[in-house]
Design a protein with these regions (language model features):
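Conserved acidic catalytic loop of the alpha/beta-hydrolase fold
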Residues: 59-63, 70-91, 100-103, 108
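Alpha/beta-hydrolase-fold enzymes
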Residues: 112-113, 118-199
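Short beta-strand/loop motif that positions the catalytic acidic residue
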Residues: 238, 244-246
């Protein structure tokens, strides 16, 4: 719209880049580009925005800064204002880490967000979620190429194992019990694990995956000075009309 009143921000999730999330966009789909101006910012650490795999010295695969959602949200705000001249968002839609970014937006810049739809996200990474993430990290860094600070080669063994561990958390018990993977083109459980989960992680840079994992672990909308470190204050700062959508079968 000429008045820029129809802007939707759609941040990326863990291990995803903008082209992985475009399936929601299309005429008659959840995000309809004939009605909305949709922007997908690539999260720091995802391999397209600043990430261990593309940082210049003194940073890089052997050393990188911790990216936080504070960084993501402030960079996105500058992108919107300085590139597109956008000061107000009709909606922020996000899944998983994208939902975390949506909630951060709502707490940090409440006057600039009209609506939030946060799917399978959280205002703060829970202890149970941290257990999952630490298990995934231990699996990946168990590869022989891990030195304690970085990988000396593409950690094929660790990435394959990471995919298999992640698959047990990402999909529900009912999904496996009912063999729903067979309804989306896979011939067996092994075929699903190899062609979906192993393949997805094998095409990623392992250092980028670790950097994004650190962002996930650090996610907490209440830690910033303006919110005084109080979760209730942070949540109370959100004035946007919000849909917080958990999954009934989520682990």
């Amino acid at each position: 719209a000429q008045d820029r009143s129809n802007v939707i921000l759609y941040p990326t999730s863990y291990g995803a880049q903008h082209h992985d999330t475009e399936w929601l966009i299309g005429k008659g789909r959840v995000l309809d580009p004939t009605e909305w101006f949709i922007i997908i910012p690539n999260m720091f650490g995802n391999g397209l925005s600043s990430s261990p795999s593309n940082l210049e010295a003194p940073y890089g695969p052997e050393r990188w800064p911790v990216f936080t959602h504070w960084d993501n949200v402030h960079a996105q705000r500058r992108l919107l204002a300085e590139v597109f001249g956008i000061e107000h968002l009709a909606l922020i839609y996000g899944w998983s880490m994208g939902a975390q970014q949506a909630l951060h937006w709502g707490a940090i810049f409440p006057d600039q967000v009209a609506r939030i739809c946060a799917v399978c996200g959280s205002a703060r990474t829970s202890i149970h979620n941290r257990v999952f993430l630490e298990g995934v990290r231990a699996t990946l860094t168990g590869d022989p190429a891990w030195t304690g600070t970085h990988f000396t080669a593409h950690p094929t063994r660790g990435l394959r194992a990471m995919g298999r561990v992640y698959a047990g958390w990402a999909m529900s018990q009912a999904f496996y019990r009912e063999k729903l993977y067979e309804t989306v083109g896979f011939t067996s459980l092994e075929d699903f694990l190899v062609r979906s989960w192993e393949a997805n992680f094998l095409r990623r840079d392992a250092h980028d995956l670790l950097a994004s994992l650190e962002t996930w672990l650090a996610s907490d909308i209440s830690v910033y000075a303006l919110l005084l470190g109080v979760r209730e204050r942070a949540l109370g700062a959100i004035t946007a009309r919000s849909i917080i959508m958990p999954s009934r079968t989520d682990l």
